[in-house]
């Protein structure tokens, strides 16, 4: 049985120029969501997620989509998740995006209506997520 294609094999070799978006954006239609950065230092307004051995901050308040993560020594998460930054992307079909990838955190639901998984791609941690249900997009400047 043939192995399923990886992102590297789907995207092929490429050389991106300064003005071009990454190939997962231009070729696959993925959309940037946030970047997660592990830290050893306590941060303001941390939320403790006991099941993950994790203190998280910044996700809902950073204008740039930066999430800070401080892990406990006994965190059950994959070592790469605890030590490497990740970039999270929205996708239209999580199952299709995960096909053939090295999944290091199985699809789960970080919040209502969202599914997310973490994968290793060429040694880098990436998060892919989709929305089970999406509400209407509200332009808050126009709403008020």
What does each of the following model-derived ranges do?
Residues 2-59, 66-79, 101-144:
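Vicinal oxygen chelate
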Residues 80-108:
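Mid-chain, well-packed structural core segment of small domains
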């Amino acid at each position: 049985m043939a192995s399923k294609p990886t992102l590297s094999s789907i995207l092929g070799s490429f050389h991106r120029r300064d003005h071009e978006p990454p190939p997962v954006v231009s070729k696959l239609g993925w959309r940037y969501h946030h970047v997660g950065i592990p830290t050893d230092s306590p941060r303001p307004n941390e939320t403790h997620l006991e099941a993950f051995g994790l203190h998280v901050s910044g996700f809902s308040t950073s204008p740039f989509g930066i999430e800070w993560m401080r892990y406990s020594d006994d965190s059950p998460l994959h070592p790469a998740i605890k030590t490497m930054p990740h970039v999270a992307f929205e996708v239209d079909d999580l199952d299709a995006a995960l096909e053939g990838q090295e999944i290091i955190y199985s699809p789960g639901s970080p919040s209502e209506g969202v599914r997310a998984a973490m994968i290793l791609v060429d040694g880098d941690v990436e998060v892919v997520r989709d929305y089970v249900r999406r509400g209407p997009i509200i332009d808050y400047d126009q709403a008020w």
